[in-house]
C-alpha cells in the first residue's frame, strides 16, 4: 500500500502549480503551495503514508464533520428540524438559497448549515470549542492538537458573509445564541491544525461502523455512521459533490486549507492534502490523488 501511495504522489505532482491557494482568508494565502501528503488508516490499525503526511495545515471545513458528529451524539434526530439533508448545488457561502428556503440550510456542510450546527453545540456546551478540541484530540489520539489563532482571527476579521447568514437565520428563528459568540467558536474549529495522519486516524470511526479503536469509544451507532457517510457522499465537496462521486466514488469532505478526507466503509479512512485549489475550492492534486487511489484499489460505494 505504501508503494502505491508513493506512486500516486509522483503521478499528481505535475498538477502542483496549476491551482491557487485560498486567498480570501489572508492567513492562508501565505501557505507554500508546493506540498502534497497522503495517509491511510485501516480498520486493522495499520498506517500508510507518503509525502508530507505529517505537515500540519488548517482543516477548515473538514471541521464541519466533527461538529456534526457532536451534534448527532447530543441531539439525535431532533437536529434535522433545523438543517436539511439535501445537496445545495450553490457555492458553500451562498445567501440566496438560505433566504428562499426560510432560513433552513440545505445541509450541514455548507457554511449556513455548519453555523446552525455550531449554534446547537453552543447551546449544549459551556465551552463549545474546548469540547470540540478535546473530542478531536481523542479521535486522533493526539493530545497536542490546537487551533491556529492567527487563522481564526483572520477569519473573524473577514466574517461579514458568515455573519450575514447567521443573522438571516436568526431573523427566521433558526439561531438561538449570540451570533458573534457562535462565529468565534466556528472559526476556532475551522482553524484547527492537523496533518494527514491525524485526520485519517480521526475519521477511522466512519469506516468502522462508528467505533473508534484509538479512543475505544462507540462514537456513533452503525446506522448513524451510514447516514453521515451518505451526507458526505452527496454534499461533502461543496458544489462539486457530483464530480467527486463520479471520479472517486467515496464519501468525502474537503476544506479550503487543501485537505480532503474520504471513507472506504469497512476498510479504511484516508486524508490527502495539497494547498492549491480548483475553481470549486477543492484541492486540485488531492482530487486527482483520490481518483488514482480509487482506480487502483477498485473500491467504491457505488459498486
Curated annotation (Swiss-Prot):
Stored Pfam families: Glutaminase
Keywords, comma-separated and alphabetical: Hydrolase
Amino-acid biosynthesis among keywords: no
UniProt cross-references to InterPro entries, sorted A to Z: Beta-lactam/transpept-like (IPR012338), Glutaminase (IPR015868)
Entry EC number(s): 3.5.1.2
GO MF term list: glutaminase activity
Amino-acid positions noted as binding substrate in the UniProt annotation, renumbered to this chain: 61, 111, 155, 162, 186, 238, 256
GO biological process: glutamate biosynthetic process; glutamine catabolic process
Reaction equations catalysed: L-glutamine + H2O = L-glutamate + NH4(+)
SUPFAM superfamilies in the cross-refs: beta-lactamase/transpeptidase-like
Segment forming the signal sequence: none
Organism superkingdom: Bacteria
Record Gene3D superfamilies: DD-peptidase/beta-lactamase superfamily
Record field: transmembrane: none
Family named by the database record: Belongs to the glutaminase family.
Assembly behavior: Homotetramer.
This protein's name: Glutaminase
Protein's organism: Marinomonas sp. (strain MWYL1)
